[in-house]
Every structure is written in C-alpha cells, then in structure tokens.
C-alpha cells in the first residue's frame, strides 16, 4: 500500500472474518452491508459483483493500484459509507482482501474509522465464488480478469455473456482487458 513500515497494518491483529461463498452470497442480500471491490479499476470494468436490489451497496474505489486504497479509505465520504455497516470485500483470489481488511481493522482499532458491523471477505475470492455458483454466477456480472494465460473466468451461463465494459477508444461493448 505504499505505507511506511510502522503504519502498515498487522495481519495478526486483523479482525476480519473469512466466509464461504454461500454465506457471502447471502450476506450480499443485506441492506446494512457495503461490498468493496478491492481489485484495480480495469478488473472491475470487465466484471464485478452486483448485489441484488435492496441488498448491499457496491463501492468501487476505482484504483489503478493498491497504493491508492488507503487514500480512498481516508476520504470523509468513504468513512461515512462504511460507518455502522457490515463491510464486505472481494478480490480475485483473496490476497488483496487480506491486506485491505487488515487496514480497515487497524483504522477501527486506532479510531480513524467509526466502528463497523464487522469485516468479511469471501474465502478464495471471486475464483471460489464463481466455482460455487458455476451455472448462474450468483451475483457476478461479466468476467473475472486473471493474471495468467487464461485471461478471464466467468460463470457457465447459457446464452450471451453480459458485457459490463466498453472499449476506451471506440466506446463499443467490450469485455476483454489486454494490458499491453
């Protein structure tokens, strides 16, 4: 996160909870929750969790990299959105959530953030969520960007893929990210 060593959050003091994909899916239906996508903005552009109507509020930090997350968390409007809510988060496989949840936990501990109703992350990230809901995708829309030769992962829904993004040059629907 680009934080100085003494300001870096401790994973040992992290109070967040790992939940399985089925429990996470149910939590997305709770209107007293917010869900944060802690991936980079280009990953969010091609696919993301869209909580059901009347459920959790989706928050997108719109980060280019993880170093921007602490700045976003410290914005007054972000703090207000998290206050008194269950904070849920997800990333591709769970690693970025470990760090992000530790930072939120630390902010609560030192009084930089008013208390939430807890912090939860889906065990195994989007990868596990999609494997748990292989046909429907659960509340997932679009593709899950992968940093390997597979490039993306998606639910096995029948019919066409719901495209969630546009080409930055021509504005046509586009669901592939090429980081070249």
Q: Where in the sequence are the language-model features?
A:
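Rhodanese-like catalytic fold shared by cysteine-dependent sulfurtransferases
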Residues: 1-17, 25-33, 40-88, 95-180
């Amino acid at each position: 996160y680009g934080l100085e060593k003494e300001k870096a959050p401790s994973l040992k003091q992290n109070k967040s909870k790992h939940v399985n994909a089925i429990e996470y899916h149910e939590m997305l239906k709770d209107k007293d929750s917010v869900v944060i996508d802690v991936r980079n903005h280009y990953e969010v552009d091609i696919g993301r969790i869209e909580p059901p109507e009347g459920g959790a509020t989706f928050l997108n930090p719109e980060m280019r990299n993880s170093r921007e997350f602490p700045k976003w968390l410290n914005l007054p409007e972000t703090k207000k959105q998290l206050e008194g809510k269950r904070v849920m988060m997800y990333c591709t496989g769970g690693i970025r959530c470990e760090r992000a949840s530790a930072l939120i936990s630390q902010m609560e501990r030192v009084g930089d953030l008013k208390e939430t109703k807890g912090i939860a992350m889906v065990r195994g990230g989007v990868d596990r969520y999609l494997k748990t809901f292989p046909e429907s995708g659960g509340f997932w829309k679009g593709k899950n960007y992968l940093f390997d030769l597979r490039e993306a992962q998606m639910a096995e829904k029948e019919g066409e893929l719901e495209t969630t993004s546009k080409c930055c040059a021509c504005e046509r629907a586009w669901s592939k990210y090429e980081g070249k």
